[in-house]
Amino acid sequence: MMKCLFFLCLCLFPILVFSSTFTSQNPINLPSESPVPKPVLDTNGKKLNPNSSYRIISTFWGALGGDVYLGKSPNSDAPCPDGVFRYNSDVGPSGTPVRFIPLSTNIFEDQLLNIQFNIPTVKLCVSYTIWKVGNLNTHLWTMLLETGGTIGKADSSYFKIVKSSKFGYNLLYCPITRPPIVCPFCRDDDFCAKVGVVIQNGKRRLALVNENPLDVLFQEV
């Protein structure tokens, strides 16, 4: 009888030791939950709505300000305005309204979306309202933002909105194809590039930059 109890204790001992390692003092490390996506907010603190139109405005005023607008690219043979520009000051014309088209149902920070100038246009020019990034401009040695993109396709038309390290938001260009073939300016860690401003023929043109990204806000129209 004593021998049977001895062997029973030997059998139970590993189970007791194993179970003791998963007490409240030694919890199982389960995978952490994914962070809840943060909605992008407009200047009134409201969530951006895919069915609404917004102006992309600067976080600065005066000569440092200026809205984003649709304009004609220099030396372009496109039949419609095909460049993404920013006015030289916040005193003057208002920017061209845009709408944001997310891959999901809502517009969140750090998620892929398309951007489209939301204006009346003829059928010929519909595609010339959708943002994309053009080929390398050898004169400015950067890639300029232009129109002529597509919605919902894995090409050069995907962007992200992220919180600025200063104030407001930044725009990122995020190609689906691995750089540098598609985007030599995109960082290797997340395949995205910052959107900033360069000077082209005296106008501020949105382009991919290595530093000083454009800080923007979204004003509902």
From Swiss-Prot:
Subcellular location: Vacuole
Stretches that traverse the bilayer: none
Note: Has a single chain structure.
Protein name: Aspartic protease inhibitor 1
Species: Solanum tuberosum
UniProt keyword annotations, A-Z: Aspartic protease inhibitor, Disulfide bond, Glycoprotein, Protease inhibitor, Serine protease inhibitor, Signal, Vacuole
GO cellular component: vacuole
Site features described as Reactive bond for chymotrypsin, chain residue numbers: 143-144
Covalent S-S links between cysteines: 80-125, 174-186
Cleavable signal peptide: 1-23
Family classification: Belongs to the protease inhibitor I3 (leguminous Kunitz-type inhibitor) family.
InterPro entries hit by this protein: Kunitz_inhibitor_STI-like_sf, Prot_inh_Kunz-lg
Job of this protein: Inhibitor of cathepsin D (aspartic protease). May also inhibit trypsin and chymotrypsin (serine proteases). Protects the plant by inhibiting proteases of invading organisms.
Induction profile: By methyl jasmonate and wounding; but not by sucrose.
Propeptide: 24-32
Highest taxon, organism lineage: Eukaryota
Glycosylation sites: 51
UniProt motif Vacuolar targeting signal: location: 26-31
GO molecular function: aspartic-type endopeptidase inhibitor activity; serine-type endopeptidase inhibitor activity
Tissue-level expression: Tubers, young leaves and flower bud. Not detected in root, stem or mature leaves.
Site feature location: Reactive bond for trypsin: 99-100
